[in-house]
UniProtKB/Swiss-Prot annotation:
Protein name as catalogued: Large ribosomal subunit protein uL30
HAMAP family: Ribosomal_uL30_A (MF_01371_A)
GO cellular component: cytosolic large ribosomal subunit
Lyase listed as a keyword: no
PANTHER family tied to this protein: 60S RIBOSOMAL PROTEIN L7, LARGE RIBOSOMAL SUBUNIT PROTEIN UL30
Assembly notes: Part of the 50S ribosomal subunit.
Keywords from the named record: Ribonucleoprotein, Ribosomal protein
Length: 165
Protein backbone atom coordinates (compact mmCIF):
# COMPACT_ATOMS: atom_id res chain seq x y z
CA UNK A 1 0.00 0.00 0.00
CA UNK A 2 1.26 3.45 -0.92
CA UNK A 3 0.81 6.64 1.09
CA UNK A 4 0.84 9.75 -1.13
CA UNK A 5 1.12 13.29 0.29
CA UNK A 6 0.78 16.53 -1.65
CA UNK A 7 3.61 18.91 -0.74
CA UNK A 8 3.22 21.77 -3.23
CA UNK A 9 0.32 24.03 -4.14
CA UNK A 10 -1.50 24.88 -7.37
CA UNK A 11 0.23 28.05 -8.48
CA UNK A 12 2.04 27.74 -11.79
CA UNK A 13 1.11 24.10 -12.30
CA UNK A 14 0.28 22.69 -15.75
CA UNK A 15 -3.35 21.75 -16.25
CA UNK A 16 -2.73 18.07 -17.02
CA UNK A 17 -0.66 17.69 -13.84
CA UNK A 18 -3.40 19.39 -11.81
CA UNK A 19 -6.00 17.08 -13.38
CA UNK A 20 -3.93 14.03 -12.43
CA UNK A 21 -3.59 15.30 -8.85
CA UNK A 22 -7.37 15.83 -8.81
CA UNK A 23 -7.92 12.22 -9.95
CA UNK A 24 -5.71 11.11 -7.06
CA UNK A 25 -7.87 13.30 -4.75
CA UNK A 26 -4.86 15.42 -3.80
CA UNK A 27 -6.34 18.90 -4.02
CA UNK A 28 -4.57 20.61 -1.10
CA UNK A 29 -1.18 20.70 0.53
CA UNK A 30 -0.64 18.19 3.40
CA UNK A 31 -3.45 15.91 2.24
CA UNK A 32 -2.73 12.18 2.21
CA UNK A 33 -4.37 9.36 0.25
CA UNK A 34 -3.82 5.62 0.54
CA UNK A 35 -3.53 3.82 -2.81
CA UNK A 36 -2.98 0.27 -3.97
CA UNK A 37 0.25 -0.24 -5.90
CA UNK A 38 -0.38 -1.00 -9.59
CA UNK A 39 0.86 0.14 -13.00
CA UNK A 40 -1.79 2.85 -13.46
CA UNK A 41 -1.11 4.38 -10.05
CA UNK A 42 2.64 4.36 -10.65
CA UNK A 43 2.16 6.14 -13.97
CA UNK A 44 0.00 8.82 -12.36
CA UNK A 45 2.54 9.30 -9.56
CA UNK A 46 5.34 9.73 -12.09
CA UNK A 47 3.31 12.48 -13.75
CA UNK A 48 2.84 14.45 -10.49
CA UNK A 49 6.20 13.50 -8.93
CA UNK A 50 7.33 17.13 -8.54
CA UNK A 51 4.26 18.00 -6.44
CA UNK A 52 3.84 14.93 -4.22
CA UNK A 53 5.88 12.50 -2.17
CA UNK A 54 5.04 8.83 -1.74
CA UNK A 55 6.25 5.54 -0.32
CA UNK A 56 5.22 2.25 1.27
CA UNK A 57 3.42 2.72 4.58
CA UNK A 58 3.97 0.20 7.38
CA UNK A 59 1.39 -1.28 9.76
CA UNK A 60 2.44 0.73 12.84
CA UNK A 61 2.24 4.11 11.08
CA UNK A 62 -1.05 3.21 9.41
CA UNK A 63 -2.52 2.22 12.78
CA UNK A 64 -1.56 5.61 14.29
CA UNK A 65 -2.92 7.38 11.20
CA UNK A 66 -6.27 5.57 11.41
CA UNK A 67 -6.60 6.27 15.14
CA UNK A 68 -5.78 9.96 15.01
CA UNK A 69 -6.76 11.26 11.57
CA UNK A 70 -9.24 8.99 9.80
CA UNK A 71 -12.77 10.43 9.67
CA UNK A 72 -16.25 9.29 8.71
CA UNK A 73 -18.46 11.47 6.56
CA UNK A 74 -19.59 14.46 8.63
CA UNK A 75 -16.13 14.79 10.23
CA UNK A 76 -16.82 12.15 12.88
CA UNK A 77 -13.88 10.27 14.38
CA UNK A 78 -13.50 6.58 13.73
CA UNK A 79 -14.20 4.81 17.06
CA UNK A 80 -13.53 1.16 17.89
CA UNK A 81 -17.27 0.33 18.01
CA UNK A 82 -18.02 1.92 14.63
CA UNK A 83 -14.89 0.31 13.22
CA UNK A 84 -16.22 -3.15 14.09
CA UNK A 85 -19.68 -2.37 12.65
CA UNK A 86 -18.45 -0.83 9.40
CA UNK A 87 -15.40 -2.95 8.55
CA UNK A 88 -15.76 -6.13 10.57
CA UNK A 89 -12.29 -5.68 12.07
CA UNK A 90 -12.06 -5.52 15.85
CA UNK A 91 -9.14 -3.13 16.17
CA UNK A 92 -7.17 -0.50 14.30
CA UNK A 93 -4.21 -2.88 14.11
CA UNK A 94 -6.24 -5.60 12.37
CA UNK A 95 -7.60 -3.09 9.86
CA UNK A 96 -4.11 -1.69 9.22
CA UNK A 97 -2.73 -5.21 8.61
CA UNK A 98 -5.54 -6.01 6.18
CA UNK A 99 -4.99 -2.74 4.30
CA UNK A 100 -1.22 -3.22 4.01
CA UNK A 101 -1.61 -6.87 2.94
CA UNK A 102 -4.14 -5.85 0.27
CA UNK A 103 -7.06 -7.86 1.68
CA UNK A 104 -9.24 -4.74 1.68
CA UNK A 105 -8.98 -1.40 -0.11
CA UNK A 106 -9.27 1.85 1.81
CA UNK A 107 -11.82 3.07 -0.76
CA UNK A 108 -14.07 0.05 -0.04
CA UNK A 109 -14.72 1.08 3.56
CA UNK A 110 -18.19 2.65 3.73
CA UNK A 111 -18.60 6.32 4.76
CA UNK A 112 -14.89 6.94 5.34
CA UNK A 113 -13.51 10.20 3.97
CA UNK A 114 -10.94 9.11 1.33
CA UNK A 115 -8.56 12.02 2.01
CA UNK A 116 -6.69 12.27 5.32
CA UNK A 117 -5.77 15.78 6.41
CA UNK A 118 -2.44 16.25 8.17
CA UNK A 119 -0.58 19.07 9.88
CA UNK A 120 2.59 20.45 8.28
CA UNK A 121 5.54 18.32 9.40
CA UNK A 122 7.34 19.09 12.64
CA UNK A 123 10.65 20.82 11.76
CA UNK A 124 9.29 21.42 8.23
CA UNK A 125 9.86 19.88 4.83
CA UNK A 126 13.23 19.66 3.20
CA UNK A 127 13.46 21.59 -0.11
CA UNK A 128 10.07 21.00 -1.77
CA UNK A 129 11.34 21.73 -5.28
CA UNK A 130 14.09 19.11 -5.06
CA UNK A 131 13.65 15.35 -5.33
CA UNK A 132 14.09 13.17 -2.26
CA UNK A 133 17.16 11.52 -3.78
CA UNK A 134 18.87 14.91 -3.99
CA UNK A 135 18.07 15.94 -0.42
CA UNK A 136 14.60 17.42 -1.00
CA UNK A 137 11.04 16.28 -0.34
CA UNK A 138 9.41 15.52 -3.70
CA UNK A 139 9.09 12.12 -5.32
CA UNK A 140 9.48 8.53 -4.17
CA UNK A 141 10.94 8.01 -0.70
CA UNK A 142 10.19 4.35 0.05
CA UNK A 143 9.88 3.37 3.72
CA UNK A 144 11.03 6.86 4.81
CA UNK A 145 7.46 8.08 4.20
CA UNK A 146 6.64 6.65 7.64
CA UNK A 147 8.97 9.13 9.37
CA UNK A 148 7.35 12.03 7.50
CA UNK A 149 3.82 10.89 8.37
CA UNK A 150 4.73 10.54 12.06
CA UNK A 151 6.12 14.10 12.00
CA UNK A 152 2.81 15.28 10.49
CA UNK A 153 0.62 13.63 13.15
CA UNK A 154 1.03 15.81 16.22
CA UNK A 155 -0.39 14.01 19.28
CA UNK A 156 -3.08 15.88 21.16
CA UNK A 157 -3.78 18.37 18.35
CA UNK A 158 -7.01 18.22 16.34
CA UNK A 159 -7.41 19.02 12.64
CA UNK A 160 -7.87 22.74 13.32
CA UNK A 161 -4.60 23.05 15.24
CA UNK A 162 -6.30 23.26 18.65
CA UNK A 163 -5.24 21.18 21.65
CA UNK A 164 -7.70 18.40 22.46
CA UNK A 165 -8.83 18.24 26.09
Amino acid sequence: MLAVIRIRGRTGIKQDIEDTAHLLRLNRINHLVLLQEDAVTKGMLQKVKDYVTWGEIDVDTLEVLLKNRCLFKGRRKLTEEELKDVTGFGSYRDLAKALVDGKIKFSEINDVVPVIRLNPPYKGYEAIKTSYRNGGSAGYRGKDINNLIRRMIIPGVDLNGQREN
